[in-house]
Amino acid sequence: MIRKDLTIRYACGSYWIISTDVHLYADASYHAPVMTNETGYHIWICLKKHFSIEETAETISGLYHISYDNALQDTKEFILLLKQNGCMEGLWKYSSLAAVIP
C-alpha cells in the first residue's frame, strides 16, 4: 500500500510524489520527491483507491487505448518504482506481483 504521508502534485510539466509529513525532512527516513508522468499519475490514483493491479491495468488500458498486457506491464513497472523509492508500506496487497517485485 502507498504510504499515507505521500501525495502527488503537478509542477513544471511533471507529476511529483512528495511527503506531506514535515518531520520526515529532519531525519534519516527522508526520501527525495519522485518524478512521474501522466500515466504514473493515473496509476497512482487507482492505487490510492485500493484498485487491484488488474483493475488498475484495465483502467489504464481503457484510458490510453493500449492493450491490457502493456497496461499491466506499465502498472508493474510503476509499482516497482514506488517500492524502490520507499513509497510503499505495510503488507503487500497485490499478491499477483510477488514474483515481479522482490
What are these regions (language model features)?
Residues 1-14:
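Hydrophobic packing positions characteristic
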Residues 13-41:
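Short alpha-helical segments that sit at the start of domains
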Residues 30-102:
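Long, charge-rich, low-complexity alpha-helical segments
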